[in-house]
Regions:
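Cofactor-/ligand-binding subdomain signature composed of acidic, glycine-rich
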Residues: 1-37
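Glycine-rich phosphate-binding loops that contact phosphosugars or nucleotide phosphates
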Residues: 35-116
Length: 116
């Protein structure tokens, strides 16, 4: 498929996702509500990071808490310590981003709250 094929199909996929929105985010909402998180940290790169950057201000306003967006490399090297008590969300458009998977492995190894 070419990029134009994805662009032409995007409105259909968006409609499908909106119809299933409660189902698609149920686990994330359950985890978020069951914890005592004071921040949200989104770990992403490339187009996933761009999408997270676009959503950041809205999420921060809606949740009334700090929301940060960091690359997987920065997360593993130094961005994992602050803010404490953050829910970490690892985002990968394809699900195969090796750097994002490495960050998720770091989260799991260090018993950090994480959703992917």
């Amino acid at each position: 498929m070419k990029m134009l094929d994805y662009v032409q199909r995007a409105h259909v996929r968006m409609g499908e996702n909106l119809e299933r929105s409660s189902e698609l985010v149920a686990l994330l909402v359950d985890i978020f509500q069951s914890g005592s998180f004071n921040a949200l940290r989104i770990v992403a790169s490339g187009s996933s990071r761009h999408a997270a950057d676009c959503a950041r201000d809205y999420l921060q306003d809606a949740l009334q808490m700090q929301v940060s967006v960091v690359t997987p490399e920065a997360f593993v090297d130094f961005e994992h310590t602050y803010p404490r008590h953050a829910l970490n969300i690892a985002v990968s458009q394809s699900g195969y981003s090796t750097n994002t998977i490495a960050a998720l492995d770091y989260m799991r190894t260090h018993d950090m709250a994480a959703v992917a």
